[in-house]
Amino acid sequence: MGIQILPPQLANQIAAGEVVERPASVVKELVENSLDAGATRIDIEIDKGGSKLIKIRDNGSGIPKDELALALSRHATSKLHSLDDLEAILSFGFRGEALASISSVSRLTLTSRTAEQTEAWQAYAEGVDMAVKVMPAAHPVGSTIEVVDLFFNTPARRRFLKSDKTEFTHIDEWLKRIALVRGDIHFTLTHNGKTVRNYRPAMNEPQYLQRLTQVAGRQFADEALRVECQHDDLRLSGYLQSPWSTVLTDTHYFYVNGRLVRDRLVNHAVRQAFAQKAEVEQPGYVLMLDIDPHQVDVNVHPAKHEVRFHQSRYVHDYILQALQSALEEAGELGFERPFEPSSPQVRDEVSLSESGAQTQTEHHAFELQSPESKTHSTWDEASRVDTSRAEISRDSSLGERTRDIASTRPYAGVQSNAYGSMAVPRESRSGSTGESRARAELPSKVAIASYGELLQTPSYNVQDKPYQPVLAMPAILNGQYWVLAQEQNLSLLPIQSVALATRSHEIETKLATGLIGQPLLMPVSIAADTDWPALLEEHETLIRQLGLELTIRYQQLIIKKVPPYLRDSQLAKVIPEWLQSLRFEAPAPNALAVWLAEQSLTGFTSAADIWAAYCQLTEEKRQQIADKAVSLPWQSWLEEQAIE
């Protein structure tokens, strides 16, 4: 048999093998088309598990009469026109295969009307013929698609369908998934004439929690932790199962730009985040990741169930850090394991003891939010400020934005963390201990001033009033050397060595009182060696003196603060190397100063900056640096020139 082009009907049926796996696949493709059309209400009608009838009705923009027949053709779509569109796709559909594939294995009727049309039109296609008949019809603005007798012309595929109940369960499960990410849409689902699901629009958080309860169950919704995290072009939001919950759940939903995907990356990040917190092997979650569409490829799976991130490691670490932070916030804000006394008398005693005393919780130093963050955050204690550095001690907090939430939930605690993340412990139906939680006080003026002072720590090369050097800067040779002329001597002074010396001197001076650490907007996580906890404890004073904030959590070293001299360094490489050196001996202050200076030389922007710093040194220090200049044998050169 020679090579030949397949007939369109056969090609569509082959494509249908990938696109149309079962009735739930048809519902998925058609509902996603309705969402792309801007529908706000979608009604789904199913008969006999979808094998007899699948009917989707929406109030979207509709399809013009001239495009009805074209819509049932292969690779016909309105959602992209170039490769650039494909690389930044945000719509659900984009290949133009669904309607053609579905119509090739069923009897399909598409009725639609646009707002510009005075009447609706209906297109009909049946199986192998693929001939589209268009006729007038009555229909409001929007579209209705009826798929009758699925797989009627492919008996082998029809035999592989399960029972009506099983097939409808798959449809119901898919609708749950899309209902969680599209809370603004009103969905209804009918099976054999009976309304099974009615998801009303969720335009605010209480309404969304009602939908979450419908989908994931009341216990998950009541105990779930809210996650809200923004960093550059990444935004993670959603809900996590309580780490102390012992209830098994199959709520494992992850969305990328509104698209439900299965991704081992997020599963690994969730398991790693819960490694030492949760009592369940696979915690439940509903997480939604918004990312620049150019940074993710959605065109790697026939059914679009998988995506590929261009920076998968970065996305993994981002999700991991956000979840770990939310879990830690939940623990620090008093979201504890529910305690249920066995007898009414014990319950009364517990209630009295909780109402008579306020719980106090000790917190470690923490990572503050970036100045750009819009989330209000407050804390209990005022910071202690001295002339050398500002230190802020973290305590539980309640800000203006969180008091509204706290008023409707017993656990009075919503804390913003380093990632802009909020962990919101939700009320448990069986317990009321949260009502007796102590509310944090508003911050004092001193605390607010200290907070601002810490976040606005100036960079090492920024000065309020630029220093005007008294000495004129020498000529520069080859962009690397200063040419020094003194009496009868000419010498070359490497600019790089001057930069290193001036920076080392500056750092060594500040080390005496301690460097001010600057919070990282996105803390860095590194796999920790077994002896690092002991190293951090042994050299705690030195680490504080350097302005570093390092913690060990879940066998990971978390870098939260660094001095300004390390902000532009590769922290994942520099910090481990420094910790390795601590195994042998603690470095002297001058050695530390040189090490920090070497990491921060990119801070100088020009030779003029370096010369200005050089001129501020004492004369003795300047002379020590100048002594390192390389003398030029200019006299011998002149003599050789004269001989020639």
Curated annotation (Swiss-Prot):
For this protein, the record's Gene3D superfamilies field holds: 3.30.230.10, Histidine kinase-like ATPase, C-terminal domain, MutL, C-terminal domain, regulatory subdomain
Region annotation (Disordered) ranges: 336-400
Q: Which Pfam families does the UniProt entry name for this protein?
A: DNA_mis_repair (PF01119), HATPase_c_3 (PF13589), MutL_C (PF08676)
Sorted alphabetically, the keyword list is: DNA damage, DNA repair
The UniProt record lists the keyword Protease: no
Q: Could you tell me what this protein does?
A: This protein is involved in the repair of mismatches in DNA. It is required for dam-dependent methyl-directed DNA mismatch repair. May act as a 'molecular matchmaker', a protein that promotes the formation of a stable complex between two or more DNA-binding proteins in an ATP-dependent manner without itself being part of a final effector complex.
Q: Which family does it belong to?
A: Belongs to the DNA mismatch repair MutL/HexB family.
The entry's protein name is DNA mismatch repair protein MutL
